[in-house]
C-alpha cells in the first residue's frame, strides 16, 4: 500500500526514562533564513519542551538524518552520535499515524496546497486549491516525503504543535520549518517511529 516498512533499522539506544535530555548551548540558528521577514509565527509561545534546542541524543544514524518520534511529538536532526537538534512537531491524529523510512524527494518555499481526493471526501468544505502564503495550512516551507502525500511542513496554527491533529503530515512552527529546510537537502533520510 503506502510503504514497505521492513527497511527500518533498530531503534536508537534508549536512555532510562528518568534521564532528561541535556541541553547544550550550541548555535541552533541556520544561516540565511529570510532575516527580517515575519513568517507568521515562531516558537515564542510554545511550551519549553517543543522549542527548538540542541539535546543529548544517541543515534547510530549519520549526521543529517531526520528521526521523527510521533509519541514524543519531536523531530530530531542528527548532528553526531550523541547530539541532535530537536524541534517540536504536530503529528497525525488517530487513524492517520504511520511509521517507516523515506527520503525528502522535493522541497518548496511557500508551497501551494491541493488536498488529496481522500481528504476532500472526508472534509468536503476544504478548498480544492490554496496558493502558498501566510494563510496556507502548509506554512512557509514543505519537504515532501518519498512519493507519498506526506510532508514535513510549516503551519499557520502554531497552537497545534505537540498535538495529534494532522492527516499524517508533520508540522512545525514556520520559523522552525524554515530553519530545518535550510539544513536538509533533497535526499535526506527520514525515519518515522511510533514506539
Predicted ranges, named:
Residues 1-195:
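N-terminal pre-domains immediately preceding structured catalytic cores
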Amino acid at each position: 500500500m503506502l510503504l514497505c516498512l521492513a527497511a527500518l533499522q533498530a531503534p536508537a539506544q534508549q536512555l532510562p526514562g528518568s534521564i532528561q535530555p541535556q541541553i547544550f548551548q550550541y548555535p541552533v540558528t541556520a544561516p540565511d533564513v529570510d532575516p527580517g521577514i515575519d513568517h507568521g509565527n515562531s516558537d515564542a509561545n510554545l511550551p519549553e519542551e517543543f522549542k527548538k534546542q540542541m539535546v543529548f541524543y544517541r543515534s547510530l544514524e549519520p549526521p543529517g538524518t531526520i528521526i521523527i518520534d510521533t509519541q514524543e511529538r519531536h523531530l530530531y536532526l542528527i548532528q553526531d552520535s550523541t547530539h541532535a537538534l530537536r524541534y517540536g512537531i504536530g503529528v497525525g491524529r488517530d487513524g492517520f499515524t504511520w511509521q517507516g523510512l523515506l527520503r525528502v524527494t522535493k522541497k518548496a518555499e511557500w508551497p501551494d496546497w491541493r488536498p488529496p481526493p481522500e481528504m476532500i471526501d472526508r472534509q468536503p468544505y476544504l478548498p480544492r486549491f490554496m496558493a502558498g502564503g501566510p494563510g496556507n495550512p502548509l506554512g512557509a516551507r514543505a519537504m515532501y516525503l518519498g512519493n507519498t502525500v506526506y510532508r514535513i511542513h510549516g503551519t499557520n496554527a502554531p497552537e497545534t504543535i505537540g498535538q495529534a491533529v494532522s492527516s499524517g503530515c508533520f508540522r512545525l512552527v514556520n520559523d522552525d520549518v524554515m530553519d530545518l529546510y535550510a539544513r536538509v537537502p533533497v535526499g535526506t533520510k527520514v525515519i518515522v517511529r511510533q514506539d
